[in-house]
């Protein structure tokens, strides 16, 4: 194992849930204002995951007061304190950039239904 690979392995987080584009997440972000620190929740749909290892990022999109807001988070950053999965989305693409042009119900992502075991 190379030196950089071992450094990357030390920096990886183990508490990251498995999520994919189309899923709706609550991302708890650590915000520092002066000498105070608080947690802010950003809830929206994952429109992309990119990269791998320590450098992996994901982008979450939400519509706030009629304006589309996207934030890109480093997956293994200490700024992200917690990631919660709200719903699983059923999409056929890895990058959901087409949601930027859609409005209203057209921008809604179908929810993935788990098969019922009988």
UniProtKB/Swiss-Prot annotation:
Record GO biological process: translation
Keyword entries, A-Z: Ribonucleoprotein, Ribosomal protein
One Gene Ontology MF term: structural constituent of ribosome
Lineage top rank: taxon: Bacteria
Gene Ontology CC annotation, any one: cytosolic large ribosomal subunit
InterPro entries membership: Ribosomal_bL19, Ribosomal_bL19_CS, Ribosomal_bL19_sf, Translation_prot_SH3-like_sf
A Pfam family annotated for this UniProt entry: Ribosomal_L19
TM stretches of this protein: none
Gene3D superfamilies (alphabetical): 2.30.30.790
Tagged with keyword Ribonucleoprotein: yes
Membership in a protein family: Belongs to the bacterial ribosomal protein bL19 family.
Role this protein plays: This protein is located at the 30S-50S ribosomal subunit interface and may play a role in the structure and function of the aminoacyl-tRNA binding site.
Name of the protein: Large ribosomal subunit protein bL19
Organism: Frankia alni (strain DSM 45986 / CECT 9034 / ACN14a)
Gene: rplS
């Amino acid at each position: 194992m190379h030196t950089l690979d071992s450094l990357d392995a030390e920096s990886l987080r183990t508490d990251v849930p498995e999520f994919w584009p189309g899923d709706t997440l609550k991302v708890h972000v650590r915000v520092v204002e002066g000498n105070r620190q608080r947690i802010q929740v950003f809830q929206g749909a994952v429109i992309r995951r990119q990269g791998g290892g320590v450098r992996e990022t994901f982008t979450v999109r939400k519509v706030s007061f009629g304006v589309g807001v996207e934030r890109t988070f480093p997956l293994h950053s200490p700024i992200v304190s917690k990631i919660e999965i709200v719903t699983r989305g059923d999409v056929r693409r890895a990058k959901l950039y087409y949601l930027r042009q859609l409005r209203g119900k057209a921008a809604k992502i179908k929810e993935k239904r788990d098969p019922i075991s009988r």
